[in-house]
Amino acid sequence: MTPMKKQLDKSLGSRRGATATRAKERADNRNTGPAAIVRLLAFIPWNRVLLHVSIFCFWLLVLSALIAGVKWLDRPVATVQVVGELNYVSRGEVKELLSPLLHASFFTSDLEGVRKSLEAHPWVKRASISRLWPDAVQVDLEEEEPFVRWRNQGYINEAGRLFVKETGVVVNGLPALIGPPHSERLVFDNFQKWKAELAKVGLDVNGVIMESRGAWLISFTDGWELNLGKQDVEGRLHRFTVLFEKKLHQEREKIASVDARYTRGVAVKWKADVTPEQG
């Protein structure tokens, strides 16, 4: 082959290579360029896409409306109404305990927490709180009713529970019970039992004392006391009731005190200057 022919073949080969390269580039451009994107978009189910987008937007609007509605409905609490007669709990104390409710959220205010705070007050027996549309709260309070006084400053309810040990509240006209610390239940039970037993002979018990050494004294509305001591208390009480019903009830207004710490009788101290008798 002549040198000229070799040069010609080489030139033709270079042209064919360049042409193939340009063809490949054009093919690549068709697969990755704007035309390829147009072809890809043609395969997307636009009707379905638009349907799903519309549904999503609809529920988004519904949710936004609900949130806005709840915010509009959830007004701050403007009024707190207290229902129930208050004899022992001051209005100031109740107002302070209810202060977390004022201007709080109507729906999310902590009613249970406030209820527990109210019932933690010694004079509050029961509390209930309810919402009143649109911006009020109603509080129902039931106070403890003192049945007897304990150690001058405390009070026991009718169920025998010492609900307050010390208080500045003074309730007049209640029976008075006194005893060592933690003896309130025993003293209360004996008071109830002896009050019922002595009422059968016309005596009204208005106080019971349990001394630290274990001795018992009963006081009556007539103004005198019965000393039962600490031994055979029930037996001594029975002997006294029999004697009182038979003999002493006619002279009850003259009695200053009765000592039942005897085996076979009692010693009576009279209000007048009379020597005590045994019977």
From Swiss-Prot:
It is found in: Cell inner membrane. One of its GO terms (biological process) is cell septum assembly. It holds the Pfam family FtsQ_DivIB_C. InterPro entries: Cell_div_FtsQ/DivIB_C (IPR005548), FtsQ (IPR026579), FtsQ_C_sf (IPR045335), POTRA (IPR034746), POTRA_FtsQ_type (IPR013685). It comes from the Bacteria. GO terms for cellular component: cell division site; plasma membrane. The chain crosses the membrane at residues 49-69. Residues 75-144 form the POTRA domain. Residues 1-28 are annotated as: Disordered. Its main location: membrane. Signal peptide: none annotated. Residues 1-48 are cytoplasmic. Residues 70-279 are periplasmic. Keywords: Cell cycle, Cell division, Cell inner membrane, Cell membrane, Membrane, Transmembrane, Transmembrane helix. It is a single-pass type II membrane protein. HAMAP family: FtsQ_subfam. Part of a complex composed of FtsB, FtsL and FtsQ. Belongs to the FtsQ/DivIB family. FtsQ subfamily. Essential cell division protein. May link together the upstream cell division proteins, which are predominantly cytoplasmic, with the downstream cell division proteins, which are predominantly periplasmic. May control correct divisome assembly. This is Cell division protein FtsQ. The gene is ftsQ.
